[in-house]
Amino acid sequence: MEVSGKTARQLFAELRATPGRARYRLGKRPALINVDLQNAYTRPEEFCTAYDGAPGQFSHVNALAAAMRRLNAPVIWSYVAFWESGEDCGVFGSKDDNADSQQNVKHGSRRAALDERLETAPSDILFPKRMPSVFHETNLQSLLTWRGCDSVIVTGGSTSGCVRATVVDAMSRGYFVCVPIECVA
């Protein structure tokens, strides 16, 4: 562990600039997983749960999604949404209970809807999820196996939260993983 006054971005920049560092690679059949790019987390002018993404994040995500479609690769959009009762949120929603609480992102609500700045296509796959990782209790693993995917490119909102959880689960399942820094918050 390094103890310093450097920011995480500074440490990351130093790591990327390390001479002789082995280049990370993707496999032969990637899928794109876009995590929680929904209004509850992308519209700070509307929702206190939202945050600002990287400059140009949506244009980068849209360009990447278009490129993946041209390759006939799966383009997946996950979003958080819960039952009207909020019971399916479990411990994840037990921290607090107010209008902005996690369990109050309801299916079909404006908070659950994908941000309108995203360019989706009819061939894209939408996954509702209830926990941080897109893999948790969804059929994502089956879909990736069926489509023959060996790697995933992950974009999204909270890099330290749901993006990270999805990345850890993907790597734990043996996928090569890439997180484009231009495509995350």
Cite the ranges covered by each PLM segment.
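Glycine-centered short loops/turns at secondary-structure junctions
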Residues: 70-73, 148, 174
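Short glycine/serine/threonine-rich phosphate/pyrophosphate-binding segments
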Residues: 159-166
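Short conserved active-site loop signatures built around small residues
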Residues: 170
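A short glycine-rich beta-strand->turn/loop micro-motif centered on a GG-aromatic cluster
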Residues: 153-156, 174-185
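Active-site acidic carboxylates
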Residues: 1-120
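Internal catalytic-core helix/loop-beta-alpha segment
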Residues: 107-156
